[in-house]
């Protein structure tokens, strides 16, 4: 597997609609204000988080169960700045919609701007032929409230192209998160 360059990413966007919307260069300023960057980089793509968040709460005294997940664990917010309570967790989603080619696996890493503030972004790999909005998991590891800025960069996707096509893609096995739109909760 090889990591793919900005040139390859641009071609995949043009020929396969791999990322939509797509920023062809790094965007660091919006309306004359500095922002957390997003857009195409040398060997990846920095995606933005939308203004749709689900923040974990304990007001309903529920238990987090991945096999029987309750929406009562969360508070929904549509905001420009999401404040995650200390040592807590929130879900968001990318603005960008991804369509992954059959011979590509995508890995996501966090942005250093957030990591240096104790905010960790986690995403499981985007598998071959998966498509949808990516649900982002934000963990505030600090004892202080932490801000996540909607419509700004949140994470970087790295595209790994295989020299072999997989026998069974995510689409072939009808994966449960296929074509997800919005913040998607755990499914079993």
UniProtKB/Swiss-Prot annotation:
Keywords: Hydrolase, Nucleotide metabolism, Nucleotide-binding. GO terms for molecular function: dCTP deaminase activity; nucleotide binding. GO terms for biological process: dUMP biosynthetic process; dUTP biosynthetic process. Belongs to the dCTP deaminase family. Catalyzes the deamination of dCTP to dUTP. NCBIfam families: dCTP_deam. It catalyses: dCTP + H2O + H(+) = dUTP + NH4(+). This is dCTP deaminase. The active site is at 137 (proton donor/acceptor). Pathway: Pyrimidine metabolism; dUMP biosynthesis; dUMP from dCTP (dUTP route): step 1/2. Homotrimer. Its EC number is 3.5.4.13. It comes from Rickettsia akari (strain Hartford). DCTP binds at residues 111-116, 135-137, 156, 170, 179-180. SUPFAM superfamilies: dUTPase-like.
